[in-house]
Amino acid sequence: AVAKRNAINVPGLADIVLPVTPVDTGLSQEDIVLPRIRMLQPVSQDVTDGIGTAGGFMNSVTGEVLPEHLEVLIFTHFKSRVKFGEAGMECMSPDGIEGSVYGLCSECDFLNWKDRIPPACALVHNYPCYILNAGIISGTPLPIALSMMKTSSKTARKLNTMVAMSHRNWFDSVFKISTMKVKNDKGTFFVYQVEKLRDAEEDEQKLGYWAYKQFAGKMEVAEETQADGFQPKKKGKDGKVPF
């Protein structure tokens, strides 16, 4: 039980009227790290601990287990890069231009294929968005990032193509995000699946446009983990990645 505490006694405190809307926190968008949708793999710690299920989703910051299928309103897109070593994340480039350890990405050897072994540095497609069927407080969805890399790169290109060919804004559509199990000689893992669910309603479009103006180019995404994307060890005989 929570112990009963004494009331705070400050002159004039009883006359103060609390604001209806939150006060200015003094934080700019650059001070905020956007939570990320984690796709749980069979090797993920949260799966082995019984918290989540393989192929499921989780909020990377709060640990909230998310629905099996996500309805997302994407409001922008940007690319980043990440390289993992034996001890975890080794180098990170939030903008895909310059890494935190190895300098300019365009001059980095870790971007190249070597003897059919894929690049050690992975390209990440980031989609800041709102989950419309989860993570809602007081009727307002909270922003989060959907990140796709490695074996989900094909899905990212499909999503990018769908939006580019529609000649519409990211926030004009609501997409359904799910996962699919893949088995091959490299193991068992899950990849993202995406399809357009419907056109966004006017209030959703306004929310997406507002978020685009507020956040685009002014945010960092919570760090990826190596389990977020399955990394094939080498190309197949045909020279292609066995996705």
Where do the PLM segments sit?
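Extended serine/threonine-enriched, polar tracts that run as long, contiguous segments within proteins
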Residues: 123-199
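Long, highly charged low-complexity segments enriched in Glu/Asp and Lys/Arg with interspersed Ser/Thr
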Residues: 75, 84, 185-243
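Intrinsic-disorder/low-complexity, polar/charged segments
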Residues: 43, 95-96, 145, 149, ...
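OB-fold ssDNA-binding interfaces and closely related basic DNA-contact patches used
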Residues: 1-139, 184-185, 197, 240-243
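Short glycine-rich, low-complexity/disordered patches
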Residues: 86, 91, 121, 173-178, ...
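Detector for methionine-enriched segments
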Residues: 39, 58, 89-92, 148-149, ...
